A protein has these predicted regions:
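Compact, glycine-rich, soluble single-domain proteins
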Residues: 30-32, 36-82
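Short glycine-enriched loop/turn motifs at secondary-structure junctions
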Residues: 1-3, 25, 47-50, 86
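Broad hydrophobic/π-residue packing in well-ordered secondary structure
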Residues: 14, 29, 92-96
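Residues that cap or initiate secondary-structure elements
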Residues: 13, 61, 87-89
């Protein structure tokens, strides 16, 4: 069972983040948080890690509807989208399916 959907992009890592943010905006989502895992791991535990960013995306209308139906749904908000670069340089975007 796969719990996510993913796509590989043939663009540099930074461009993949920009394209992902633009695509989210087109679908009514705003990026309300951005976690640079590579930078965080380096600064907190002095570990070198590949480019990996978590974008926290939110569609306020959908979030409001969901919260009216189930108050604990906030545990899954915002919707996380990852942009990561593999060790061989491939860039992938993934989100929960």
């Amino acid at each position: 069972m796969t719990y996510y959907m993913a796509a590989k992009l043939q663009v540099p890592f930074g461009d993949a983040i920009e394209r992902t943010e633009a695509a989210l905006k087109t679908e009514g989502f705003g990026v309300i948080s951005r976690i640079d895992i590579q930078q965080t791991l380096k600064s907190k535990v002095d570990v070198d890690f590949r480019p990996y960013t978590i974008l926290g995306a939110c569609n306020p209308g959908l979030a409001h509807e969901a919260l009216q139906l189930e108050d604990k749904v906030g545990l899954m908000l915002p919707c996380n989208v990852i942009v990561q670069q593999s060790r061989i340089g491939e860039v992938e975007v993934a989100a929960i399916d």
